[in-house]
Amino acid sequence: MVNRTAIIKQPDNISCFNDVYKLQKEYQEALILDNSNPDFIWIGEHQLCYTLGRGSNYDNLLFSLNDEKYDVFKIDRGGEVTCHMPGQLVTYLILDLKNFNKDLNWYLRKIEKIIIKILGNFNIDCHLKKGFTGVWIENKKIASIGIGCRRWITINGFSINFNCELENFNKIVPCGIENCLMANMIDYNKNLNIKEVKKIVKKIIQEEFNFDFVSK
């Protein structure tokens, strides 16, 4: 496969979800209009917020939408409600699947493979769970996936809990899974820092998609 150029952004600050979502939409629209434009990868952290997919059930929010303490966004992805917050590493991939494989099931399995390789790099033993999307450690979920796709241009991506306040997941039914327990990477390898994990995320995505990265 010929290497494809991708723009990568890895901000050090904690980012507002809505600002980054608008950025994703801009890059997606640019690729739809002209597929010679580069793909786009964003790796970072968000301020506390909750996001719902296109068909999400609002019953999985265990607080009122009128409660101004919580920022809630309905976005272009599949899946149910999830939570983003500092200490959780989020990766967005705006890719033209026509250059890889026009198969969303293939793409989801690819992301799961990437997550397992990332965690394995830090000697964290994880696995898939039959009937569910995402990655698990023992009986706890450590990584969630939510994607959208328009004209084979993807949006959104995956999150890995690094060292976040897992209590924030108690405000929802995570991914619509009753009694879903969540896990942090740091609980399984104390000698980690999030900057090192970000480097490995970048490296593995570059290898799996044969990207030439350009920082912007």
From Swiss-Prot:
SUPFAM superfamilies per UniProt: Class II aaRS and biotin synthetases
Active site: 175
Family per similarity comment: Belongs to the LipB family.
EC number(s) recorded for this UniProt protein: 2.3.1.181
GO terms, biological process: protein modification process
GO MF annotation list: lipoyl(octanoyl) transferase activity
Gene: lipB
Protein name: Octanoyltransferase
HAMAP family: LipB (MF_00013)
Note: In the reaction, the free carboxyl group of octanoic acid is attached via an amide linkage to the epsilon-amino group of a specific lysine residue of lipoyl domains of lipoate-dependent enzymes.
The organism's place on the tree of life at top rank: Bacteria
Site keyed Lowers pKa of active site Cys: positions: 141
Catalytic activity field: octanoyl-[ACP] + L-lysyl-[protein] = N(6)-octanoyl-L-lysyl-[protein] + holo-[ACP] + H(+)
